[in-house]
Design a protein with these regions (language model features):
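ATP-binding/catalytic-site motifs of ATP-hydrolyzing domains
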Residues: 60, 66, 212
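Helix-to-loop junction immediately C-terminal to a conserved catalytic motif
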Residues: 51
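The feature captures the beta-strand-to-loop junction immediately N-terminal to the Walker
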Residues: 36-38
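Short coil-to-beta microelement around the adenine-binding A-loop and adjacent beta1/P-loop entry
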Residues: 16-18
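Conserved post-Walker A/P-loop segment of ABC ATPase nucleotide-binding domains
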Residues: 54-62
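ABC ATPase nucleotide-binding domains
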Residues: 73-234
């Protein structure tokens, strides 16, 4: 197994387009690292540079203690699993998994043991004699993973491996990949645009935008302490609500003025706004849907953060409901208990959990209060 180090790594194409800009990251042995971001953010390009499928324009890439910028992909001791399974249709599952080992002229008895061991891990043993056309999408993806496992690489690279699966299979395969990481104890770098995969699988997540790292952190910290407006809006579904408000300082309390209301912030958040000289300035504040309440008990406990609005849309998702309404010109989503009596057209009171408010600079979009 191995650690990885990327120092000042850049990718510039001949037309001058910078796909990856000054990428710096230290990955520890056995970590499960997720690269996440919107399409075109540079996450797959970075993975391909690690794999050796894209040249590094500048910077240094180390796998273990070895600089591998100019090392051929086959000599980097990595294995890739792609979005497309790329299985040989005329070969059995066994032969698909064994093919790379045969090319490397590994002894036949070793190949047999490695393939059967990997098949056992992935629950493929009953399927070893089948052809890919007789397999489900999830089974085919497990075969693709098995083909990577038999190589016993130092690092697994996975490029959106679940994108071609339906929703139910994606959930099942997510669990399988998590179990696989626990069993193998190997380093995994995983690319996805799906934040659910990122939050559930990663030990750390690298959020990217326009080829630049926005934040590297644990899933919980990314969710609870986003460093800027982009990360706050990208992580979480439904996404964080964003509203503009004017800061008004009274003594040692900073208030957010919006829709005729003045929301007093807790001491720590107030201090950061006051120390930053935000009195009288317009800021953007964010609140997650689950921190917007319609229960009377919470409303009575938080009288200074109560708003009234008319429900526009009601979405029932079993145990919870999404309520959509406006606060001035800003759309707001609340995630509430399914036992709510609120329905479209109803005027409802809501309270915000002021402890969970995030305040961002209007110009730089950097967080002020975390």
């Amino acid at each position: 197994m191995a650690s990885l180090s990327l120092k000042n790594v850049c990718k510039v194409y001949p037309n001058g387009f910078e796909a990856v800009k000054d990428f710096n990251l230290e990955i520890q042995d056995q970590e499960f690292i997720i690269f996440v971001g919107p399409s075109g953010c540079g996450k797959s390009t970075t993975l391909r540079m690690i794999a050796g499928l894209e040249d590094i324009s500048s910077g240094e890439l180390k796998i273990g203690d070895r600089v591998v910028n100019d090392v051929e992909p086959k000599d980097r001791d990595i294995a890739m699993v792609f979005q497309n399974y790329a299985l040989y249709p005329h070969m059995s599952v066994y032969d698909n998994m064994a093919f790379g080992l045969k090319l490397r002229k590994v002894p036949k008895d070793e190949i047999d043991k490695m393939v059967k061991d990997a098949a056992k891990i992935l629950d493929l043993t009953p399927l070893l004699d089948r052809k890919p056309k007789a397999l489900s999408g999830g089974q085919r993806q497990r075969v693709a993973m098995g083909r990577a496992i038999v190589r016993n690489p130092k690092v697994f690279l996975m490029d959106e491996p679940l994108s071609n699966l339906d929703a139910k299979l994606r959930v099942q395969m997510r669990i399988e990949i998590a179990k696989l990481h626990q069993r193998l104890g190997t380093t995994i770098i995983y690319v996805t645009h799906d934040q659910t995969e990122a939050m559930t699988l990663g030990t750390r997540i690298v959020v990217m935008k326009d080829g630049v790292i926005q934040q590297v952190d644990t899933p919980q910290n990314l969710y609870e302490k986003p460093c800027n407006l982009f990360v706050a809006g990208f992580m979480g579904s439904p996404q964080m609500n964003f509203l503009d408000a004017t800061v008004e300082v009274a003594g040692d309390v900073a208030n957010l003025k919006i829709a005729g209301h003045s929301i007093p912030l807790p001491p720590a958040k107030s201090k950061k706004l006051i120390d930053g000289g935000y009195d009288g300035k317009v800021v953007t504040f964010g609140i997650r849907p689950e921190d917007v309440y319609d229960s009377e008990m919470y409303i009575e406990a938080s009288p200074n953060s109560v708003f009234e609005s008319t429900i526009k849309v009601y979405e029932l998702l079993g145990a919870e409901v999404y309520l959509y309404f406006d606060l001035e010109e800003f759309p707001v989503t609340a995630r509430v208990d399914s036992r709510t009596t609120a329905r479209p057209g109803d005027t409802v009171r809501f309270a915000l959990d002021v402890e969970k408010i995030h305040v961002f600079d209007k110009d730089t979009e950097q967080v002020i209060t975390n």
